[in-house]
Structure formats: C-alpha cells, structure tokens
C-alpha cells in the first residue's frame, strides 16, 4: 500500500502533488528528530528536480528527505494514506 502510493507520486504522469500519511516511525530514534514507535501526520512530496521524496510533519516541526520508496518504507509503517492536491 505505502510503496504503491509513493511510486504513484513519483510517476511523472501522476497528477497527485502530495500524500497525507498517518504513519508510525520505525527507524532509529533521533533520526532527524523522529522518535521510534511514535505516530505522525506526514505530508510527502516527490521533488523531481532533486530526485527525492521530502517528508515533513503536518505541523512543519520535523523534516526528512528520502532518496527512494524503499528507504521511506523501511522507516515508516503507514496506517492511512490520502492523496493531496
């Protein structure tokens, strides 16, 4: 589910500009300020000019870039995904 949504976002033909995701961080605590096991409301965008995903918390407090769908999926477990504009 998560990988498919990220790949759709990355697709140049996609009209989706962002994803809103509720996810639990499964990576290492302290990585860019995120805490293992905590749920976050995220906004994810794919920046084509940089070739990466940019993830920020909905409140804008935390940010983390990811180079691939695999890297993102390795650190997050999504419970809800909604396409944004």
Predicted region positions:
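Mixed-charge, Lys/Arg-rich low-complexity intrinsically disordered regions
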Residues: 1-28
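Compositionally biased regions
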Residues: 15, 19, 50, 69, ...
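Intrinsic-disorder/low-complexity peptide segments enriched for small residues
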Residues: 4-7, 17-19, 40-41, 60, ...
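Intrinsically disordered, low-complexity segments
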Residues: 12, 16, 29, 34, ...
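Short amphipathic beta-strand and strand-loop transition segments with alternating hydrophobic
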Residues: 11, 44-45, 78-80
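Intrinsically disordered, low-complexity peptide-like regions
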Residues: 5-9, 57, 73
